[in-house]
């Protein structure tokens, strides 16, 4: 039986295992034939959407890995706008509105509100937080 999943990632790209574990879990459930509709990045998890992140050559590039997963499997990557702006992650529109010199949101990620999280959670069979 195939299930629809939604993930919420609250851990940063680096510093603890939550984001890495979420990515590994996402890959595993897709390999098993399940569907992953949305990954919502909240709290420190918004750092997973910072395109300026530059890990060492021997580390997994989680930002690009999430992007690749989303492209390959049509997964929506939503980033809590309030949490992102608070932590210095912004898209071009918000940077312009806030009179900042540039944006750093990785392509493939989208700033959104908690309403997107609620919609995703209501539309899936399993909701898992990392």
Swiss-Prot record:
Q: Where in the cell is it found?
A: Cytoplasm
Q: Which UniProt keywords apply?
A: Cytoplasm, Transferase, tRNA processing
Q: Does the keyword Nuclease apply?
A: no
Q: Name one GO cellular component term.
A: sulfurtransferase complex
Listed SUPFAM superfamilies: DsrEFH-like
| Predominant cellular place of this UniProt entry's protein | cytoplasm
| Residue positions of the active site | 80 (cysteine persulfide intermediate)
The UniProt entry, under Pfam families, shows: DsrE (PF02635)
EC number assigned by the record: 2.8.1.-
Q: Does the keyword DNA repair apply?
A: no
Q: Name one GO molecular function term.
A: sulfur carrier activity
Swiss-Prot/TrEMBL GO biological process terms: tRNA wobble position uridine thiolation
* InterPro entries cross-referenced by the UniProt entry: DsrEFH-like (IPR027396), Sulphur_relay_DsrE/F-like (IPR003787), Sulphur_relay_TusD/DsrE (IPR017463)
Q: Which family does it belong to?
A: Belongs to the DsrE/TusD family.
Say what the protein does.
Part of a sulfur-relay system required for 2-thiolation of 5-methylaminomethyl-2-thiouridine (mnm(5)s(2)U) at tRNA wobble positions. Accepts sulfur from TusA and transfers it in turn to TusE.
Q: How does it assemble?
A: Heterohexamer, formed by a dimer of trimers. The hexameric TusBCD complex contains 2 copies each of TusB, TusC and TusD. The TusBCD complex interacts with TusE.
Report the protein name in the record.
Answer: Sulfurtransferase TusD
Q: Which organism is it from?
A: Sodalis glossinidius (strain morsitans)
